[in-house]
Amino acid sequence: MIKVGLIGYGKAGQAVAEVLKEDPRFELVWVAKRNPWPEDQPLPLGLPVFAMSQGDFGEWLDAHPVDALVDFSDADTIHLYGEEVRKRHLTLVSAVSAYSDESLAYARSLGEQARVLCSPNITLGTNFLILSARMLRGIAPIADGEILEQHFREKPEMSGTARKIAKTLDLDHDRITSLRLGGIVGLHEVIFGFPHQTVRITHESIRREAFGTGAAFALGELSKQPYGFYTFDDLLMTMIREQLTQPETRQQP
């Protein structure tokens, strides 16, 4: 069983905590957030809570050791715990979507002494969408490409996942259409226009628990890898290669 600490306890973090708590492969040991937990509120899932802004993270880990960290906080928090990841060789799955070039380079450096995965969208389906779209783009580069992203109306910025799709497909950001409607958790669609046909690749997160199942998938697969910096694509490609090298199973007549 892998002991896990969860950093970040917003709406997504809360959903992730519920999934990890129920997965028999993991033991969710604690939750960390930037500010102290309100004293008049019950602890999340009965777990201890660490305030990143006020305590010593190394001392916290000494008292509450874990094997892995899952980060659903913000782009700056990695600098508060990164050296402990390096020193203790902790597995890190980060779903932060807006790392600066400096912070992303720092995350890559942690991969020299630990297993580190960074993915702006941690859902399995979205990452399979990106991989599939990249493959089709490589097969048929002449096709027109457009990206549609839909999210809840309170989300102000362009989706980090949409930006990643655009970068992967070598599309300008003006080829991204953003819609903000009601309570949509997240929908991404890549549309390829051919002269006589259209291909649409779509993924929709119905509940935020999809982030939790994606993080659990990443943790399970990352634990099998050597130290290094990984993307979700790396994990998927490893599994696809394994599938392609397996003998084809034929149904007997």
Located regions from the model:
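Rossmann-fold dehydrogenase core element
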Residues: 91, 106-123, 140-144
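Structural motif
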Residues: 7, 72-73, 95, 119
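Rossmann-fold NAD(P)-binding glycine/threonine-rich loop
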Residues: 76, 81, 96-116, 127, ...
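Rossmann-like NAD(P)H-binding beta-loop-alpha module
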Residues: 128-142
